[in-house]
């Protein structure tokens, strides 16, 4: 539903000046969006929480969302007037945020990771990968508009490190050595980011971190289910998907709690994960610069078909059918 997506980005654009003030207050250029935004756009996170000043991947998330909206709608007027300003200012933030320690070592130090057990760490996998993608998206947006991108965006993007263990498993942050994690972090590099596409690396990361996740927020199982489906494991994906929402359902309205057995409802992030599993996992959808496309996908044996309606600006319907284990997909 592009109008709803646009309204969310409109909220960010209308508060861009507040994000610019926030960046300046921390000694950076560009825009630094708050972790918990007040109506004014100022940081509203309680002062005792480290997420406010340090969980800075939110800034990259805003930029990536702007580019995704353009990719779906191809609305150049919007990109020129609102999308590119968001992308430019968030990219400028990262060029000032990195510590330039030489080629391949433009480190992002002292952050709270997407895995919020990891606080005040350096070179967090998700933060670094999201910053890289934000910088690359800003350059792509500039080229769409016929504007020369700041060459430092590409320079910084290619020098932000993604750390790995000797066997190729992505390391969550500098010094990470197998500690328990709260929620998905490294796993996010395969989806929704595009930092890792190699199936063997994604599988290795899922196996390694899946054994280390605590009983955390509901959205983690959604990421695992999406990636498992994309790896050609529909039955494993279905079991993960079902676990992710069944264990978090709260009567009488079947709302989704933040943590299994918790009464903190309604947890919108968990509900969003449920929806994304249907669209980008079992539904096979993917946002690309050419628009929404559909990948080959397989349904679990428990389902005969899956119908997705009202997708994208043209309100397409996608039907995925399972027949003799040879599912078909069609768009109308």
Language-model regions, residue ranges each:
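Active-site core of glycosidic bond-cleaving carbohydrate-active enzymes
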Residues: 1-16, 64, 71, 81, ...
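Non-catalytic C-terminal accessory modules of carbohydrate-active enzymes
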Residues: 47, 228, 235-332
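Glycine- and aromatic-rich loop/turn segments at beta-sheet edges
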Residues: 20-33, 95-112, 116, 162-171, ...
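Short, glycine/acidic-rich hinge or "gate" loops at secondary-structure transitions
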Residues: 24-26, 79-82, 99-108, 145-150, ...
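C-terminal, helix-dominated tail/subdomain
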Residues: 108-145, 150-152, 264-273, 294-312
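Aromatic-rich carbohydrate-recognition surfaces in CAZymes
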Residues: 1-99, 127-128, 135-138, 267-284
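Aromatic-lined, polymer-binding surfaces characteristic
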Residues: 97-129, 214-221, 227-231, 268
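Acidic/His metal-coordination segments adjacent to aromatic residues that form catalytic metal sites
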Residues: 35-54, 108-123, 251-263
């Amino acid at each position: 539903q592009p109008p709803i997506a646009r309204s969310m980005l409109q909220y960010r654009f209308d508060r861009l000046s507040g994000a610019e003030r926030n960046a300046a207050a921390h000694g950076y250029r560009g825009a630094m969006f708050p972790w918990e935004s007040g109506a004014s756009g100022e940081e509203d996170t309680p002062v005792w929480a480290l997420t406010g000043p340090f969980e800075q991947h939110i800034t990259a998330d805003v930029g990536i969302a702007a580019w995704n909206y353009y990719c779906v709608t191809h609305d150049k007027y919007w990109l020129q007037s609102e999308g590119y300003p968001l992308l430019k200012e968030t990219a400028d933030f990262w060029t000032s945020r990195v510590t330039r320690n030489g080629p391949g070592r433009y480190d992002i130090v002292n952050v709270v990771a997407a895995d919020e057990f990891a606080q005040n760490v350096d070179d967090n996998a998700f933060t670094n990968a999201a910053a890289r993608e934000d910088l690359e998206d800003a350059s792509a947006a500039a080229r769409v508009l016929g504007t020369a991108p700041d060459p430092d965006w590409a320079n910084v993007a290619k020098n932000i490190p993604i750390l790995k263990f000797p066997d190729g498993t992505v390391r969550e942050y500098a010094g990470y050595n197998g500690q328990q994690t709260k929620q998905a972090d490294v796993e996010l590099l395969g989806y929704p980011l595009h930092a890792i596409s190699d199936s063997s690396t994604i599988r290795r990361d899922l196996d390694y971190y899946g054994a280390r996740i605590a009983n955390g927020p509901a959205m983690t199982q959604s990421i695992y289910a999406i990636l498992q489906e994309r790896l050609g494991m529909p039955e494993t994906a279905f079991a993960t998907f079902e676990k992710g929402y069944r264990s978090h359902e709260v009567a009488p309205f079947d709302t989704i709690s933040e943590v299994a057995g918790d009464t903190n409802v309604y947890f919108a992030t968990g509900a969003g994960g449920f929806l994304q599993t249907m669209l980008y996992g079992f539904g096979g959808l993917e946002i690309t610069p050419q628009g929404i496309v559909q990948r080959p996908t397989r349904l679990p044996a428990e389902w005969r078909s899956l119908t997705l309606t009202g997708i994208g600006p043209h309100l397409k319907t996608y039907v995925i059918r399972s027949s003799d284990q040879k599912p078909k997909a069609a768009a109308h």
